[in-house]
Amino acid sequence: MKVLRRIVLPLLLITAAAMLLGGCSGDGDAKKDDAGKTSEANKEKVFTIGIVQIVEHPSLNEIREAFINGLAAQGYVDGEKIKIDYQNAQGDQVNLKTICQKFVSSKYDLIVPIATPSAQAAAGETKEIPILFTACTNPLGDGLVNDLQKPGKNITGTSDAVDVAQIMDLALKLTPDIKTIGTIYNSGETNASYVVKELLKYAEAQGMSVVEKTITNSSEVQQAAMSLVDKVDAIFIPIDNTVASAMPVVSQVANQAKIPVYVSADSLVADGGLATYGIDYTVLGEETAKMAVEIINGKNPGDIPVKTMKDLKIYINKTTAETIGVEIPQDIADQAEFFSLAAPEK
C-alpha cells in the first residue's frame, strides 16, 4: 500500500503540474490573441487625413489650426484616433498636384484642401476618396459641387463667400469720397476673378470706376500696388491667395500714400488693410472640423450640404485708420472688432 502511494502521488502531482502549465500556456495564447485583436482594432481606428494648403498666409493658417483644434475638441487628436499629414504647395501648382497625387496613392481616408486652388487640384485627382474643402469662395461656380444643398460625388465643404456690396457699403461709410477704386488679383485664381466681377457690378451701379491690376505671383504685388496709389481713391483686395501672401507689402505702399485698402478677410485687416465686413476664419475651421467628424463616422460627403458662413463681423485696423487719418464713426465702432498690426482688440 505504501509502495502504491509512493507511485500514485508523484503521478498525480506531475499530472496536476502539466495541467497547470497547459492552462497557463492556453491563457497566455488567449491573451496574445486578445492583444492582437486589440492592436488590430486600434489600427483600424486610425483615420488618415491629408491637409493641403496652396500657400502660407494667415487666413489659411488660421483655418488649418482651427480645423485641427476643432477635431481635437471632438475627441479626434492627431496621433491617436487620427493621423494628419499637412503639406504646403508654397504657391506652386506643380507641387499642389504632386501633393494631391501622393494623398491619393497613399489611400488616405480624407483629403482636406484649403482654398479653391487646392480643392480643384484634389478634385482632379480622385472621385473616390472623400474631399472636404474649406475657404472656397464659389464652389458651385467653380464646378466643385453639383448643388450646395446636395453636393453629390465625393465632395463637400465650407465656403468663405464674401458679400462685396456689404464691404463696399462699409467702405463708403468710412471713406465716402471714393470715385475710383483699384484692385489687385491673380486672374488665374477663379475665386479672385469671381469676386472682382462682383466688384465691377457694384461699381457700375454706384457710378464708380475700377482700375484692375492682375498679377501671376506674389513678387509682382508691390509694383502693382505702387502703380495704383496715384490713380485711385481706395484699393480693394478680393479673396486671392497670391495677393494675401504679400498683403503686408500692399499695406505699406498704401499707408504711405494715405490710400485705404478694403479687403475680403479678417487676417488681411490684421496685416494692415483698413477694414472688411466678413467671416471669422477660426469659426470656418471649426465648422469644417464638425463636418469632418460626420465623414469619419461614415457619412457620405455628397450628402452633406456645403456650409456658407452667415455670421459676419466688421473688422477694422485701428493702427491703419490712425496712420491714414480715417475717423471711425461711433455706430460702426460699436459693432467692430479692432486690430492693431499685431493683435485684435474687442
Where are these regions (language model features)?
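Structural motif
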Residues: 83-105, 214-228
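An alpha-beta-alpha
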Residues: 49, 67, 156-203, 305-321
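Beta-alpha junction/loop-to-helix N-cap segments that form part of ligand/metal-binding clefts
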Residues: 89-146, 237-259, 264
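Bacterial lipoprotein signal-peptidase II cleavage site
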Residues: 21-38
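Hydrophobic alpha-helical segments within soluble ligand-binding/sensing domains
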Residues: 139-152, 156-178, 279-299
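Extracytoplasmic "Venus flytrap"
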Residues: 46-68, 74, 85-94, 188-190, ...
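Hinge/cleft segment of the Venus flytrap/periplasmic-binding protein
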Residues: 294-346
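Pocket-lining segment of extracytoplasmic ligand-binding domains
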Residues: 190-265
